[in-house]
Amino acid sequence: MKNIVAEIQGSYGPVNLAERVLQKIWCSGDFRRDNLKTCTGEKLEIVKFGEWNKLDGPDFKNVEILIDNIKICGDVEIHFYENDWNLHQHGGNAAYRNVILHVVLFPNPSGTPKITENSRGDSMKTLVLLPYLNRDLEEYALDEALVAVEMQLEKSESGIAELLADIPERERIDVLRERARERWQQKCFFSKKRLTEAGWTQFCHQIVLETLGLKHNRAAMSHLAQRFSTTTMLGMSAENLFNAEAGNWKSFPIRPANHPKNRLAQYLKLLEKNPDWQTMLKASVAHFQKIENATKWTQIFRKQSQLKRIHDYFKEQVFAGTLTGTRFETLMVDAILPALAGTTERDLFEYWFHWNLGDAPANIQKSLKNANVLSREMPMSNGLFQGVILLELQKSRSRKK
């Protein structure tokens, strides 16, 4: 199956978006699925997303949808543009005779679909995905690229040594800080955009559930946050919530602690112990003091800023001791700190950089130590990891050119 790539204009320049990313969005249901409408105005409900076909033919087989409450079964084909159907000559290909829904990313300039029949001549509806996406297109593309980079780094301890080999040892920390700063700016940009669209309370509700769903169940958790408010969830059990997304959970390969039912139970415990956590979270920015001429050395910064005290305040007070381990650290660096920066205009980069490492490849610390990056003054931190993955991403893109 050919993986077609389109170039889109992102906030940080052109971004390559693979058609596979669109297929993953459909497969995981990582878009707003309530109040879906076809291009011709019919109400669309998705009963089954179908099986992802990675061979020739339609992208998804055995899909079930409701069009104006009428059940229809068949296949789904996904493209960037409606006219890709003609460019790929699907209209004359019998393999596409059962397509019932054409999912496209971008709308037809005229606003009206021109392709309304599959290769058998039966009616085929069109859904434009762009208005229903949960996140910025650039964020989807970047996430996909970063997952590939993390998998690459996880495979080999020598990968980081090779990555840093052409950088003099005395400059490595500075280079990683520069890349980490870029990563921070990206996170803050995407966070601020989502904040503007959703509002503080809903945004917080969604990002915490999404983080608890990493990596395989982010979309299902996001959909739960859209369907049920925190108030509604308080009257539900983890079993109720789990069943509400029945058929959309990925139960492999995850550890028992990461099972969605256990993660939902954690979130319900947070709502029970601290129902006002979103308000407390917004006010928590006062705990971050402004440090002039902050040192780059993690050990010194953590002491100067009283970072452990701040860390424990979030863990024990805001999140009421309900979230622990690397998943709590991931929540803070991937969601909470960028969100606080986005809503208060405070530059929290140094705190984010020197924060504890969250979920990451198991060999990252040993690899950085072997590359002479880590020391007593520079223990492992979130920022070093973020710098590594963005540096690897940029170098991998350069190699492909």
Regions found by a protein language model. Give the residues of each.
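Hydrophobic, aromatic-lined core segments that form the binding pocket/scaffold
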Residues: I173-K400
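Short Lys/Arg-enriched alpha/beta "domain-start" segment
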Residues: A6-E45
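Internal, well-ordered alpha/beta segment that forms a basic, Gly-enriched binding/recognition surface
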Residues: V103-T232
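Active-site metal-binding core of divalent-cation-utilizing nuclease and nuclease-like domains
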Residues: L44-P58, E64-D68
